[in-house]
Swiss-Prot record:
Induction text: The dps-DNA complex accumulates during stationary phase and under nitrogen, sulfur, and phosphate stress, but not under iron limitation.
Main location: cytoplasm
Binding site for Fe cation 2: 81
Top-level enzyme category: oxidoreductase
Gene name for this UniProt entry: dps
Gene3D superfamilies to which the protein is assigned, alphabetical: 1.20.1260.10
Quaternary structure and partners: Homohexamer.
Pfam families recorded: Ferritin
Positions contributing to Fe cation 1 binding: 50, 78, 81
Reported cofactor(s): heme
GO cellular component: cytoplasm
Cofactor, free-text remark: Binds 1 heme per molecule.
Record-given protein name: DNA protection during starvation protein
Length: 176
């Protein structure tokens, strides 16, 4: 594949109309791409769990996984739009996604419900840690709008994490 027609390389940060210097936005875009990659990988993981979940709690988990990948898809959209607005290029190449994601990518295969949820919780917790660091970083760099965006995503990510914790309560998802 050739790069004919390439207008901006992934590592290139263009000037923006938001009044933020590229010395600032380059740091912000790097962090946002880590978050974007992590959410794109998590989207695929939730979608796989939605497709493959089985067992006594099928319906509630099937719906939860669908709601979760829908919410994560919204985060992907918002982060990608913000990256573009800041003059960056949203990450999309599968190998780059794997490189930038902040959590261990689940292996291929079908897992039992408890294991699926444990993998999802570990991913959400890693993303929460990343989001908290990014929120502090963008605030220190003077980008309040990105901070506001990240805080909204942080709240929704926390909510998914504690919902997963409820599914993992000791009296649920027992093996027969």
């Amino acid at each position: 594949m050739t790069n004919t027609g390439l207008v901006q390389s992934f590592s290139q940060i263009e000037p923006n109309v938001l009044g933020l210097e590229t010395s600032v936005t380059s740091q912000i875009c790097e962090g946002l791409n880590r978050a974007l990659a992590s959410f794109q990988v998590l989207y695929l993981q939730y979608q796989k769990h939605h497709f493959t979940v089985q067992g006594a709690e099928f319906y509630s988990l099937h719906e939860f996984f669908e709601d979760s990948y829908g919410s994560v898809k919204d985060h992907v959209h918002d982060l990608g739009e913000r990256l573009n607005g800041l003059g960056g290029v949203p990450v999309a190449h599968p190998l780059k996604l794997a490189e930038l994601t902040c959590f261990a990518i689940e292996e291929d295969g079908v897992f039992n419900c408890r294991t699926m949820l444990e993998h999802d919780l570990a991913a959400e917790q890693a993303i929460l840690s990343l989001l908290r660091r990014l929120t502090a970083q963008v605030e220190s760099l003077g980008d309040r709008a990105t901070r506001y965006l990240l805080e909204g995503i942080l709240l929704k990510t926390e909510e998914r994490a504690y919902h997963i914790a409820h599914f993992l309560a000791p009296d649920s998802l027992k093996l027969a």
